[in-house]
């Protein structure tokens, strides 16, 4: 099932609601409209971004003109994940992995231990990624999160995980079909009550779009959307179907470096990047 493309880009969620100033601003003002991620199959990947309005904030992330990029990968681990990890190791770049634990990727869950040992951030994306299931009710969503935490607990310290990304983004409208018009509002409030931070993205690789875009197309998509942005949270996928993302990744990293960006995990960004990433 496809959804119409909409202008705008989701970025910070409740971080944007509480604009944090200091060495790093945790939210970015509304960005200019352009192409967004499209969703092919709402029960699985890819994610979709919908129009959102981030809390107003200065675009300068640090007050000194420093540019920051967070590379984020959804829907893994999979057979593609080792390729991504190898590039990140070679380039000495941290990333944030929003993991799931569906039937088709459970055998790859031990890779989460490798991600953790390599200094990457593990965050939550639900176990099943099935919209009909997770967005049926708040109880269904948190039950799915509980299943994910249980599945990944042998490979990482789940007590330390405080970040998540809602499938479809925090302002998705698909969820209304299953849980009513207030389902996302309720889930965001509950996430905050439970001590979670939720984050979307403002740069989309469109790597999970229909037709399996080439590595060159993925590279161009990212560059197009990252142009003139001081803070970039890049949405990519490390699924079996997105091996071209792994092929594009070295060039993507090189471009951000050439443009003077500093690489951070989402948590490092949240902490104003007080913990220096490997490449700094």
Where are these regions (language model features)?
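Catalytic domains of cell-wall/extracellular-matrix polysaccharide-remodeling enzymes
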Residues: 129-235, 239-255, 261-262, 268-269, ...
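Terminal accessory/targeting
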Residues: 1-70, 86-95, 154, 202, ...
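Active-site beta->alpha N-cap acidic-glycine motif
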Residues: 40-161, 271-272
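Residue-identity detector for glycine
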Residues: 8, 22, 29, 33, ...
């Amino acid at each position: 099932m496809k959804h119409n493309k909409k202008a705008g880009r989701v970025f910070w969620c409740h971080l944007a609601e509480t604009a944090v100033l200091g060495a790093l601003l945790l939210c970015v003002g509304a960005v200019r409209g352009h192409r967004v991620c499209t969703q092919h199959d709402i029960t699985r990947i890819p994610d979709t971004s919908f129009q959102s309005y981030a809390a107003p904030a200065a675009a300068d992330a640090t007050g000194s003109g420093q540019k920051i990029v967070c590379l984020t990968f959804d829907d893994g681990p999979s057979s593609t994940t080792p390729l991504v990890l190898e590039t990140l190791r070679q380039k000495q770049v941290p990333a944030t992995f929003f993991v799931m634990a569906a039937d088709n990727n459970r055998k790859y869950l031990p890779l989460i231990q490798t991600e953790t040992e390599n200094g990457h951030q593990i965050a939550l994306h639900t176990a099943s990624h099935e919209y009909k299931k997770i967005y049926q009710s708040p109880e269904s969503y948190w039950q799915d999160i509980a299943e994910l935490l249980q599945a990944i607990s042998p490979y990482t310290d789940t007590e330390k995980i405080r970040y998540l990304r809602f499938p479809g983004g925090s302002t998705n409208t698909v969820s209304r079909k299953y849980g009513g018009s207030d389902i996302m509002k309720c889930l965001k409030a509950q996430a905050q009550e439970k001590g979670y931070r939720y984050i979307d993205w403002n740069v989309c690789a469109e790597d999970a779009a229909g037709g399996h875009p080439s590595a060159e197309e993925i590279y161009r998509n990212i560059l197009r959307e990252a142009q003139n942005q001081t803070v970039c949270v890049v949405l990519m996928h490390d699924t079996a179907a997105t091996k071209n993302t792994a092929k594009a990744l070295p060039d993507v990293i090189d471009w951000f470096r050439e443009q003077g960006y500093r690489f951070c995990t989402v948590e490092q960004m949240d902490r104003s990047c007080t913990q220096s990433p490997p490449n700094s």
